[in-house]
Amino acid sequence: MSILKKPDLSDPILRQKLAKGMGHNYYGEPAWPNDLLYMFPVVILGTIACLTGLAVLDPALVGEPADPFATPLEILPEWYLYPVFQILRIVPNKLLGIVLQSMIPLGLIAIPFIESVNKFQNPFRRPIATAVFLFGTVFTLYLGIGAALPIDKSLTLGLF
């Protein structure tokens, strides 16, 4: 098995695109040993050094002690669960909310099969995958921002 990814040059459509100058004539350098031995350890050690430096220079506070007698008006989950919380909050039927959330991983699993005819890795040459990614990112940000707002403003984000 080769370390380099090589395209199927017997495909006539791909050969026509390569003849027009579309595609890559150079397929990169091998991952072993260039990336795995030299670049990854530098990036990992640099990340650890940055995190250690930030932790030493500005330690995070634990927070204020919990008061069991002061309940907030609206309880919110952690920030990374805001989009999921917003789906459950705005969908009228809770079973439909669960079904919608189970469709997200199924849709992500289906993307490679939908886009399997495309032999390019460049995102600008993969319009379906790029469109799904951009739509999912914008929609997730929309749901996350809406979850932080009160329920009457969460669908419109308070804009109208």
UniProtKB/Swiss-Prot annotation:
One of its GO terms (molecular function) is electron transporter, transferring electrons within cytochrome b6/f complex of photosystem II activity. Its main location: membrane. The keyword Electron transport applies. The chain crosses the membrane at residues 36-56, 95-115, 131-151. It is found in: Cellular thylakoid membrane. Pfam families: Cytochrom_B_C. This is Cytochrome b6-f complex subunit 4. It comes from Synechococcus elongatus (strain ATCC 33912 / PCC 7942 / FACHB-805) (Anacystis nidulans R2). The gene is petD.
